A protein has these predicted regions:
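Extracytoplasmic
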Residues: 18-53, 71, 161, 254-259
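Hydrophobic core of transmembrane alpha-helices in multi-pass small-molecule transporters
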Residues: 28, 109-124, 325-339
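Extracytoplasmic gate region of multi-pass secondary transporters
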Residues: 34-45, 229-288
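Conserved MFS/SLC helix-loop-helix module at the cytosolic interface between two early adjacent transmembrane helices
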Residues: 69-107
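Helix-to-loop junctions at the C-terminal end of transmembrane segments
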Residues: 70-82, 287-298, 383-384
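Intracellular juxtamembrane helix-capping segments at the cytosolic ends
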Residues: 123-137, 339-352
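A late C-terminal transmembrane helix in Major Facilitator Superfamily
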Residues: 148, 157, 351-386
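C-terminal transmembrane helical hairpin of 12-TM major facilitator-type secondary transporters
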Residues: 277-287, 296-347
Length: 422
């Protein structure tokens, strides 16, 4: 196996790591700019234009639904010939969408420009980046590589969020949206320079592949696996897809309602933001460890991360009783957040190999998009119904316990893809 290292014997950085860096930059600036940084804009935009928070937030649902439709159409075209073209096109469209946001004078402009933003989100960010990293790393290094890529994404997001907060505070929310467009330009430069479909395009062997003595095979590693038509007919595939959706229902709810939950519990907005930033930084350090666990025993990483994520929502529920529950929330969120973006793509590779990964990852991210479209809005509706966050977070806990059971079922040894048997 080509060793898990950053430089070759000549001291040059392996090209695989430029792929990881590119994925981190693209998702850190673009994915996070579209989804994770929305909180920085919400109050400035709604107060300046006199919009309700609910009406303004609807653009996120429009964006998510557009991204789902986009993935249905383009996932089958994410291949060696088209992936770079798709990412560049999506980046240009994303720049246009944020320029439109910066010029918005009414609610409908946000709704209109949310459509091209959804195309950018689907065709440039998580799906193609996960696919590229998956292509460039073999089964013995894939989990660590994805976790390092996501750790880099988180660090870049923290930088982006602080820059946006400063720009919005000093200038305006319009300048903030233009800053996101600038970040997309930076991401595009990385795509143009570094994106290659697989190590075969560079004539090199990828990190993490077994040696010939470990696994003799006639086909290259990136071509081994179950046909998509067979994989999609298996019930376990749909169980996994539903688990991806439920995990993101909870994740998107935490993203939008985690800080408000802490504020309602008695934290100041500044304290709640500081807690969130601190957790994100610690998660950067924990992510590679979770990836290491998944490389060695995916069932342990998948089940434990999902269960910890469930316990984090219990902590959020208990904040209505005691502020000290923030410790429970924080500890288990750090250990559990990997269940969304680290574990989800590994499940399909574990069960079916890599031949159908472009389309399977497309389906994974379609279901992630469905969860993202309705998670935050659903929890907000439950909050209005019950008058507090306690019961809504317990409902999220129940959903994550289902995720835990599905991941235990799908990572059983008998479901692991074996090229000699399959």
């Amino acid at each position: 196996m080509k060793g898990f290292s950053f430089k070759d014997e000549n001291g040059k950085i392996y090209y695989e790591w430029w792929i990881v860096l590119t994925a981190a930059v693209v998702t850190g600036f673009v994915y996070s700019g579209i989804v994770s940084a929305t909180g920085a804009f919400m109050l400035p935009v709604t107060q300046d234009l006199g919009l309700s928070v609910a009406a303004y937030s609807l653009y996120l649902t429009i964006m998510s639904l557009t991204s789902i439709l986009t993935l249905v159409i383009v996932s089958k075209h994410m291949d060696r010939k088209n992936i770079k073209k798709l990412m560049i096109t999506a980046g240009i469209i994303g720049i246009i969408s944020f320029a439109g946001f910066a010029l918005a004078q009414n609610l409908w402009m946000f709704y209109i420009f949310a459509v091209p933003q959804g195309f950018c989100f689907a065709a440039m960010t998580m799906t193609p980046c996960q696919l590229l990293v998956s292509n460039w790393f073999g089964e013995k290094a894939k989990g660590r590589a994805i976790s390092i890529f996501l750790a880099g994404m988180q660090l870049i997001f923290i930088l982006e969020l602080n820059v946006l907060t400063a720009v919005i505070g000093r200038f305006s929310w319009r300048a903030g949206y233009m800053m996101v467009a600038v970040f997309i330009v930076i991401a595009l430069l990385f795509v143009i320079k570094f994106v290659k479909w697989s190590p075969e395009d560079k004539g090199i062997k990828r990190i993490g592949d077994p040696d010939v003595a470990e696994r003799a095979a006639a086909l290259p590693a990136v071509e081994q696996g179950v046909e998509f038509s067979m994989a999609i007919r298996k019930p376990v595939t749909w169980f996994v897809l539903i688990s991806c959706c439920l995990a993101v229902v909870a994740s998107s709810a935490i993203l939008q309602h985690g800080i408000p939950t802490m504020v309602v519990a008695g934290f100041t907005p500044a304290q709640a933001t500081a807690v969130t930033s601190a957790l994100s930084l610690v998660a950067v350090l924990i992510g590679p460890f979770v990836g290491w666990v998944c490389d060695r025993k995916l069932s342990v990483g998948a089940v434990c991360s999902a269960f910890c994520f469930a316990l984090s929502t219990v902590g959020l529920s208990m904040l209505s009783v005691s502020k000290s529950a923030v410790v429970m929330y924080g500890v288990f969120w750090i250990l559990g957040v990997a269940t969304v973006n680290i574990v989800s793509p590994l499940l399909m590779s574990y069960m079916y190999g890599e031949k159908a990964m472009p389309r399977l990852l497309g389906y994974v991210n379609i279901f992630i998009g469905i969860g993202g479209a309705f998670g935050a809005a659903g929890l907000g509706a439950l909050y209005e119904k019950f008058g507090s966050y306690q019961t809504p977070w317990l409902i999220a806990t129940a959903a994550l316990l289902i995720v835990t059971l599905v991941r235990a079922y799908s990572t059983a040894p008998k479901r692991k893809y074996d090229p000699e048997k399959n």
